[in-house]
Amino acid sequence: MKKSTSLSALYLASMLAVGLSSCSSTHVEAPAPLLPVPESKQVEWQKMETYAFIHFGLNTFNDREWGYGDTPAEVFNPARLDCEQWARTLVAAGMKGVILTAKHHDGFCLWPFAGTDYSVANSPYKDGKGDIVRELSEACKKYGLKFAVYLSPWDRHQANYGTPEYLDYFYAQLRDLLTNYGEVFEVWFDGANGGDGWYGGAKETRTIDRRNYYNYPRIYEMLDSIQPQAVIFSDGGPGCRWVGNERGFAGATNWSFLRKGEVYPGYDKSYELQYGHVDGDQWVAAECDVSIRPGWFYHPEQDSLVKTPEQLVDLYYRSVGHNGTLLLNFPVDRNGLIHPIDSANAVRFHQIIQEELKTNLVAGLTPQVSDERGGAYVASALTDNDYDTFWATTDSVVTADITFAFPSALRMNRMLLQEYIPLGQRVKAFTVEYRDASGNWQPVVLNEETTTIGYKRLLRFSSVVSDGIRIRITDARGPLCLNNIGVYDAGEQADKLFEEVQASKMQSFPFTLAGVNAESAAAASDRDEKTTCFVDGDLLTVDLGSERFVSSFHFLPDQGEPNRGLISHYELSVADADRQHVREVK
């Protein structure tokens, strides 16, 4: 009885405090924006959260991922192509939009571009009268999806690729897509550029200056003048960035910043993009691209290898839930349809997410907070389900506690946190705690570091049953601005599924190697099995940059020369926070 009474008193006290501050401070200014901040179109883009990729073209029929550029256009002949089937499937799977590969690296165009004969206009599809870009654009309008285009800068078909003349051809393609197919929400530029190709029959390897050849500033100017609402994707943005992998996840630490001018399409330090640049001066949030199958294009032998709904759910939590967006690819099959296995798994994935995050246990509750700015920026804004209202601290306060008390103990295993990103990304570290049966606060055991929040942070943890939960912001770049908090019970199977997924995945932190030159050290983290870092001596120091939660250590021996540099015995030690004391890990 005493416990129940104290909880009620706590709840009433928090309500009273909020009411007094709201009445007494009606002209409080919002916190000043903390640079860099997003453009409004970048905020709207991130609110989409999940959207689809469609890879479809000659590669679908020649069983390749990267076509050489010499497959005849006549090979393209989908018998039952139905863009409305694509749109219906994507809506049922919770996708908010779709990006179509209008032209992949092989140079084949899915629309009748007048500048080439290598397009649907010279294929059997609809007797050369088809236009898949238009068909999908119209299907999107009918079913309420946003539409976007992928256009490969690299073209293995064009004879003049690598010359200034090719740029005129490429710019004309881009202008055609931007002016004739309605509004697009994104334009996608691939980082794969230059290499071997057909090139009009030359059959040779061509290299380009990936940073300067395409004159991206001119391209961006064209895009902004024709489709100002569109977000531009490339390795370095400027609208949104590649996340640095094609496995669909961002780092648990993920800043929406990059250092301006440093990252470009084909950037050779792509591992940085998984985490962003904490010292960046340009807002470029991460897009996490992944295919529902092993390949980006359809291959019949992969029908049994489609990602399960549970695997897709895991990717959602590690992309959207790690301050990114999820771009999920659907390889359209040779009939011109999204395969039924892909469709069923994607729809079930969406249903699971809806089920797990259906009921917010703190909706409408006003938490007790250790600091409050007042005016409109009060604690009640954290649970009012309004994106544009937010709680904020006073200017000098960069740490705070947010405490929820429940009338009785509840089971919980999911949490949602959101910062109000129009004013910038701020939080650098936080913890989550629950109140045990004795009234003491205990840490919620999480499988990942709790550093950044950004647009959205989703946390999964083994169920706790408690009458109180607390979020403690322990470090930030400036005064805090949070607009939503959610706490959920994902159901009885949540713990089992969560544990199974955790056992099957691995996520690496960025690191530097002491005593190893930069070129050799890069080989240790580039995820390329063909490169190897060799170390002189028998001591290797791995610097993680800051204190981290580490659950395992993995290394891959040299794959080129199996007998070179193999480790037969080793000891692993870790340094304390002050880096003065080292202890062996047993």
Predicted features along the sequence, with ranges:
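C-terminal motif of bacterial Sec signal peptides marking the signal peptidase cleavage site
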Residues: 21-22
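Extended extracellular/luminal ectodomain segments enriched in beta-structured repeat modules
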Residues: 398-399, 407-414, 466, 545-552
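Bacterial N-terminal signal peptides that target proteins for export
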Residues: 2-11
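A short beta-strand element within beta-rich, extracytoplasmic domains
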Residues: 410-422, 471, 549-560
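Noncatalytic modules at the cell exterior or secretory-pathway interfaces
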Residues: 462-474
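Mature catalytic domains of secreted/periplasmic carbohydrate-active enzymes
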Residues: 26-398, 403-404, 416-425, 434, ...
